[in-house]
C-alpha cells in the first residue's frame, strides 16, 4: 500500500518517456500522431518538449537513442532530460542527431501548443494561443477552445478566443446554421485577417463555380464582407490621417526654428539641418552617459537631453550669428553660400569626432510599443509623443513671442528695425538671441528625430529642403502659418503616397508649392517683416 503511489508515479513517468520516444519515428505521420498524443496529456512538462521540437532543440543520442533537449554553449552541447528538465551531461555534435520536422508537422505542433497554453495562468500566453488557433483553425480544437472561453475573464482574451472559435465553426464540416452564426460573430471583427477568411468563401475556380457550395452561406458572407471592407476603408483613412499628422509634426519640429531665423530675420540658414543634427548627437552623448553612470535612470535620458540639446544648438547658433551672419545681413547670396559651407564643416567635424556610421539612440520604455486599435490600426507611442511634443514647442514659442519682453522686442525689430533701434532696443543683441532661439529649437527637433531616424552626420540634410518648403508655404515669419503648412504638407504627402509613391508624391508637392507661391508669394499667412521690406 505504501509503495503503490510511488509505483503509479513511476508508471506515469515511464509512459510519458515512451511518448517522447515516439517522436523519433521515421515517418512524419507517426511523428504527428506522437505530437497529438503528447498534447492530449496536457501536463506542464509537454510544453517545453514541443517547443524544443519546434525550435530544433530536440535531439537523440546515437549510442542509446534517448531523446534529449539540447542547448548549445560555444562548441559544447548541454543535454537535458525532456521530462525532468534536469541536465544529464554534454556531448559533441557527432554524438547527437536532430529530430527533423516539416512544415505540416510545424503547423500541428503550433496548434498543439496553442491548445496547451489556452489554459495557462499567464494572460500573454493565452492571448498568443488564441491568435495561433485563429490562424490555424482545426475542428479538434473547438471543444477545448469553447471550454477556455467559458472560464476566461479577460475581455480582450475572450474576444480573441471568440474569433478563433468562430473561425473553426465556419469550417465546411459544420451545419449551415452554425456557419451563418459564425459569420455573424466574425462580422464584428473589423480586421484584414477576418476579411481574408470570409473572402475565401467567395472564391471561384476556373469554371466559375464557387468554392463554397451553399448559397445562403455565400450571401451572408458577402454582406458581412461588404460591411467589413467599408469600415476598413474608413479606418484606413484614419490611419493615413494619423501618419500625415505624424509626418507634419516632424516637419513642424524641423521647420519651426527655421521659421524664426528665416521667417523673422530673413536669414537663409543652410546650416539649419546641422543644428538639428547637433541636437541628435547631444541626445546620443546624454544616453551614453546614462548607460555608463546611471543605467537605472535611462528612461529619464530624453528629459535631460531636451534642454541640453537646446543649449548646445542655441550656443552654436549664437556663435554663428556673431561670427558670420551679422556681417552678411542684406546679402542673401553670400549668406546662403556661407551657411552652406558651414554645414559642410559641421558635418565633417561630426564625422571626425563620432565617425561616419550611424549611432544608436535608444527609446525609453514609455515610448516603446503602440496603441493597437480595431481594424488593424497601430499608433506607435513614439509618434504620438512627438506629435504632442511638437504642439507643446509651438505653444511655448507663441507664448514667448507674445507675452515676454524678449518676444515684444523681437516683434518690434521684425516689423520696423530702425524705429525699434530709435526706441532704445539693442537690435544686434535681439538678432543674436533670435538666431540662437531658432537654432535651439532645431536642437530640440534633433532630440525628437533621433527617435525616428538614424543619427548620422547627414541627418539634417534630409529635412532642410522640406523645412524651407513648410516656411514658404505657410507664410514667412508666421508660426501659425508654419504649423498649418507643416500639417498640410504632411497630410498631402501621406494621402498621395499610395497612388504616386513617396518620391513622386514629394515631386507633386513641390510643383504644387511652386504654383501656389505664384498666386500667393507670401504664403498662406502673410506677415510684414525685414525680408519683405527689403
Kindly give the residue locations of the regions a language model identified.
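Cytosolic-side transmembrane-helix boundaries in multi-pass membrane proteins
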Residues: 338, 357-358, 365, 415-418, ...
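Helix-loop-helix "hairpin" substructures at the membrane interface of multi-pass membrane proteins
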Residues: 378-455, 484
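Transmembrane helix-bundle core of multi-pass membrane transporters
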Residues: 335-403, 430-433, 500, 530-534
